[in-house]
Amino acid sequence: MRLLILTGFILTLLYACRSTKVIQKAIEKKDTVAVVVPVDVPTHDDTVKLIAAIFDGYKAIEYKTFAAKIKVDYFNSKGKQPDFVANVRMRKDSIIWVSISNDLGIEGFRVLIDKDSIRVMDKLANTYQVKPLTSMQDIVQIPFSLSSIQELLVGNPVFFNRDSVIAYTKTEKGYTLLSSGELFKNLLSFNNGFAFEKSKLDDKDLMRNRTADLSYFEYESKTGVMFSTYREMFLSHQNKLDIQLKFKDYKFNEALSYPFNVPKKFKRIQ
């Protein structure tokens, strides 16, 4: 299927959203020497103060527009799959534009996502599709939004509610917060400088055995924004998927265009 590469990229992001949205509330630490303190024990006041300090120290990325070139490598149960480059442009709460090409720079697909729909041009087959965003929601089985995908791409924690924190840990390496949603647990880890390092998502239904590990590395601040330029996603449900994202040429708050002109010769398909 010609849309396999495109679907793999977008569904990778959406699956992570899924495990984050339903999970939206957890952040935990693997360090075995850490002391976990439930929020509702006698140290509640100290817990509240620590959680507040973490959120005061952590600065979510604020932006109006964002653009980046992303090198995508991924592995599934059959081994390494063909890598590709995704050029992404976004206007917050409005639009996501993606151009997918191979290492030689030959564009294969172009995608436009807004609050209601997803449009896909297959430049290899001279076809295009227009589908409601809800069709993607059905595939990943969560009511995600445009803004959820944007937050995931820019590197902010998604679907996390500080009011749902049930435990925390403090170690020499940093902090973790654990929250629990209806279907998932979400574990967020921060270093001592309050940089967001990891989100670990676990399905509360052990029969589904659904997990996701999202890790953030190689922070830099070339644009005045602390930004993770290398990320790893390990997804496990019925199959396992390992995705590596390398961000290059990223920029914030610059004027962007979102060209999506369908040639007359392209055939619309369902």
Where are these regions (language model features)?
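Positively charged n-region of N-terminal signal peptides that target proteins for export
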Residues: 1-5
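C-terminal motif of bacterial Sec signal peptides marking the signal peptidase cleavage site
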Residues: 13-16
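Gly/Pro-enriched, hydrophobic low-complexity segments
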Residues: 19-26, 166-270
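Coil residues (strongly favoring Ser/Thr
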Residues: 31-32, 47, 94, 117, ...
